[in-house]
């Protein structure tokens, strides 16, 4: 994920302009990723959200997933849970910028979608949430003043599924440092094959938070009020 298409240079911020907030990844099981329309339920497999910086001032000095994204030159290591059933999936990766989120509709959503095929011996088919509908503009992790002294942060959306990953924001090295839920052992390791990646992009204004769903016809970044 990078604000400049195809750019992975550390000389350029992946998300600039103090766009601090969480990085979340969802997946959705579909019959055929090449024709899926994004209406199937999505479950969360990864999140890198917030951690307190004891030496900082307000929440903007704290550790955030988007800061890790910048530190890693726009790349985030995300492990596909090994317990997932094989087949086609849509993958929704999003960064939520909270620098203007002190009032409703101030958060900004940057979303990328992929079509992937998972292979392996897993059997889990987690329940999910729908987009639009999973977020509200007034959710505590979406409408928040990050410039105050934060004691905690509530990540938007559902919990990470068993076998997914909850990263520790601000950790040295790879952003992936902690496992969310209880991983389920499988006899054969799960692998991922990217079957199709949508390359077109457009800014889609919304007013309800997370109203953009993954679709094979578009790969977009969406903003609550259509602005950066």
What are these regions (language model features)?
Residues 89-93:
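A short tyrosine-centered beta-strand micro-motif
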Residues 79-80, 97:
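Short acidic/polar micro-motifs centered on Gly/Asp/Asn
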Residues 80, 85-87:
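A glycine-anchored, Pro-Gly-centered beta-turn/N-cap motif
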């Amino acid at each position: 994920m990078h604000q400049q298409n195809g750019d992975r240079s550390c000389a350029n911020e992946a998300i600039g302009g103090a766009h601090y907030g969480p990085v979340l990844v969802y997946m959705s099981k579909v019959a055929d990723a090449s024709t899926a329309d994004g209406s199937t339920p999505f479950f969360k497999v990864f999140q890198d959200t917030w951690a307190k910086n004891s030496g900082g001032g307000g929440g903007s000095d704290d550790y955030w997933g988007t800061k890790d994204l910048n530190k890693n030159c726009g790349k985030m290591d995300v492990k596909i849970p090994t317990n997932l059933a094989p087949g086609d999936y849509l993958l929704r990766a999003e960064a939520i910028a909270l620098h203007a989120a002190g009032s409703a509709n101030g958060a900004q959503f940057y979303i990328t979608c992929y079509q992937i095929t998972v292979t392996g011996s897993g059997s889990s088919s987690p329940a999910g949430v729908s987009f639009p509908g999973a977020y509200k503009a007034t959710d505590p992790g979406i409408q928040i003043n990050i410039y105050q002294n934060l004691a905690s942060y509530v990540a938007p959306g559902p919990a990470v599924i068993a076998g997914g990953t909850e990263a520790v924001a601000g950790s040295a090295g790879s952003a992936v440092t902690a496992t969310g839920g209880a991983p389920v052992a499988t006899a054969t390791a799960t692998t991922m094959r990217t079957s199709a990646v949508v390359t077109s992009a457009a800014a889609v204004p919304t007013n309800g938070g997370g109203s953009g769903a993954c679709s094979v016809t578009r790969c977009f970044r969406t903003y609550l009020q259509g602005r950066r």
